[in-house]
């Protein structure tokens, strides 16, 4: 479960030690409602492989061999409100469009009010940006907050294409939704 993870040659994951108290973890392997209206999605189907970001990431197995990390443990969190969804992702290695498709399958009738997360396309070729932008034009969230691994370079592209719908998110930013006012 806790295999060492790497980006290139640098260890890049949560280090497992025998002293780690696993009783403090809640392992999620199916769509789970944590509290009323807050859902965790532990499984994101890869529908569009062009929007995946696995390059240079590896897992070291017990025998010392390395296999590509496809981030099967990546989660997305969704706040479901009567007027729509707020979707929170981390670095979206499995693809933000794939995350959106997975969430839309569970809640097809609700619009996306907020999409917040990293898209992991910093320094990526423009075609990676275009895959995401094309999908977001089709399924347009009211607000899109991009985080650090999207990159300032790609944030500029998003701002050009989406205007005031997009903002650059940062640590400590307070975002309120209508039901939490």
For the regions a protein language model found, what residue spans apply to each?
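Metallo-beta-lactamase
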Residues: 1-75, 162, 167-181
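Cap/insert and terminal regions of metallo-dependent hydrolase folds
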Residues: 67-76, 80-87, 91-171
């Amino acid at each position: 479960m806790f295999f060492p993870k790497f980006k290139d040659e640098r260890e890049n994951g949560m280090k497992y030690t025998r002293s780690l108290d696993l009783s403090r973890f809640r392992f999620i392997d199916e769509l789970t409602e944590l509290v009323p209206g807050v859902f965790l999605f532990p499984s994101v189907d890869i529908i569009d492989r062009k929007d995946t970001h696995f390059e240079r990431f590896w897992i070291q197995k017990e025998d010392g061999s390395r296999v590509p990390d496809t981030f099967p443990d990546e989660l997305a969190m969704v706040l479901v409100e009567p007027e729509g969804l707020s979707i929170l992702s981390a670095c979206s290695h499995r693809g933000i469009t794939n995350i959106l498709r997975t969430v839309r399958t569970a809640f097809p009738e609700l619009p996306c009010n907020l999409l917040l997360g990293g898209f992991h396309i910093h320094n990526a070729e423009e075609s990676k940006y275009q895959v995401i932008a094309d999908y977001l034009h089709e399924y347009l969230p009211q607000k899109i907050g991009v985080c650090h691994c999207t990159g300032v370079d790609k944030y500029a592209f998003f701002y050009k294409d989406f205007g005031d719908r997009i903002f650059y998110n940062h640590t400590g930013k307070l975002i309120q939704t209508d039901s939490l006012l």
